[in-house]
C-alpha cells in the first residue's frame, strides 16, 4: 500500500470509512477534504454488477452535465461541406478532412475530444493507433459520430462527459470542480446517476450498483449508499 502524506491523512480523518453517506453529505465532505493547491476535480467511481465481457453489458454513453465540467475543452471535427461549416460556427477548435487526418498522423494531439461525420470514419479509422489508446476515437454511442456536428460541438463545449465500464466493471468520471457549489455538484452527480441507471442492461443480474464513491483529486474516497442510489 502506498504511504499517504500528512495532508491526505488529515483529510481522511474527516471521513468515516465505515459509513455510507447520502449524496448531499458526500458532496459537502468532498469539498471539505480537498487539499490540493489547485482547483481539483470531483471524481465519481462506480462498481457495477455487469459482465463487461458480454456485448450487451458493455455500458457506454455520454451526458451533458447541467453545470458543466469547469474545464475548457478543445474539440476537433472531421467533416466536409455543410457539416464542416456548422462545426466551425459552433466553435470547434479545428475542422478538416484529409488535411486534418494527415496533421494528426504527423503528431498533432492538442485536443481533448474528436467528432466525425459517418462518412469520415473510414479515414478517421486510419488514426486508430493514435486515437484508440487515448480513448479519443469517435463513437456513435457517445454522440461523437454524427451528422449534426454543430450540436455535438455545443454539447462537448457545454460540459458533456463520457462514461464507460472498464474490464473491472467500474466507471470513473469527473462531475466538476471543488470550486463548484454543493448544489451544482449535486445536480451534476444526479444527472450522471440517472444516466447510469438508464443504461442498466436488461441482462444484468444482482444489485446493479455494487458500490459508489466520490473524491476530490488526491483526496480520500467517500462511500455512498448504493441502495439509496437505486431507489
Swiss-Prot record:
Q: Which domain of life is it from?
A: Bacteria
In alphabetical order, the GO MF annotations are: rRNA binding; structural constituent of ribosome; tRNA binding
- UniProt-listed PROSITE patterns: RIBOSOMAL_L1
Which Pfam families does the entry link to?
Answer: Ribosomal_L1
Keyword list (alphabetical) reads: Repressor, Ribonucleoprotein, Ribosomal protein, RNA-binding, rRNA-binding, Translation regulation, tRNA-binding
Gene Ontology BP terms: regulation of translation; translation
Name the InterPro entries on file: Ribosom_uL1_bac-type, Ribosomal_uL1, Ribosomal_uL1-like, Ribosomal_uL1/biogenesis, Ribosomal_uL1_3-a/b-sand, Ribosomal_uL1_CS
Q: Which GO terms describe its cellular component?
A: large ribosomal subunit
- Cite the PANTHER family for this sequence: 54S RIBOSOMAL PROTEIN L1, MITOCHONDRIAL, LARGE RIBOSOMAL SUBUNIT PROTEIN UL1M
Q: What does this protein do?
A: Binds directly to 23S rRNA. The L1 stalk is quite mobile in the ribosome, and is involved in E site tRNA release.
Record's subunit section = Part of the 50S ribosomal subunit.
Protein family according to the UniProt entry:
Belongs to the universal ribosomal protein uL1 family.
Give the protein's recorded name. Answer: Large ribosomal subunit protein uL1
Q: Which organism is it from?
A: Lactobacillus delbrueckii subsp. bulgaricus (strain ATCC 11842 / DSM 20081 / BCRC 10696 / JCM 1002 / NBRC 13953 / NCIMB 11778 / NCTC 12712 / WDCM 00102 / Lb 14)
Amino acid at each position: 500500500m502506498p504511504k499517504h502524506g500528512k495532508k491526505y491523512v488529515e483529510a481522511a480523518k474527516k471521513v468515516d470509512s465505515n459509513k455510507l453517506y447520502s449524496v448531499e453529505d458526500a458532496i459537502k465532505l468532498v469539498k471539505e477534504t480537498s487539499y490540493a493547491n489547485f482547483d481539483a476535480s470531483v471524481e465519481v467511481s462506480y462498481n457495477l454488477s455487469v459482465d463487461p465481457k458480454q456485448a450487451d453489458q458493455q455500458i457506454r454513453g455520454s451526458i451533458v452535465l447541467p453545470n458543466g465540467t469547469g474545464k475548457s475543452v478543445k474539440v476537433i471535427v472531421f467533416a466536409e461541406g455543410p457539416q464542416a461549416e456548422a462545426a466551425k460556427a459552433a466553435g470547434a477548435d479545428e475542422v478538416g478532412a484529409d488535411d486534418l487526418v494527415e496533421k494528426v498522423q504527423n503528431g498533432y494531439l492538442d485536443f481533448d475530444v474528436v467528432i466525425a461525420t459517418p462518412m469520415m470514419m473510414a479515414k478517421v479509422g486510419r488514426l486508430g493507433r493514435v486515437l484508440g489508446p487515448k480513448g479519443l476515437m469517435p463513437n456513435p454511442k457517445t454522440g461523437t459520430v454524427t451528422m449534426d456536428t454543430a450540436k455535438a460541438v455545443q454539447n462537448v463545449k457545454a460540459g458533456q462527459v463520457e462514461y464507460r465500464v472498464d474490464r473491472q466493471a467500474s466507471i470513473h468520471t469527473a462531475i466538476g470542480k471543488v470550486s463548484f457549489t454543493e448544489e451544482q455538484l449535486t445536480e451534476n452527480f444526479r444527472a450522471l446517476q440517472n444516466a447510469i441507471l438508464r443504461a442498466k442492461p436488461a441482462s444484468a443480474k444482482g444489485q446493479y450498483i455494487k458500490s459508489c464513491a466520490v473524491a476530490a483529486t488526491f483526496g480520500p474516497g467517500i462511500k455512498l449508499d448504493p441502495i439509496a442510489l437505486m431507489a
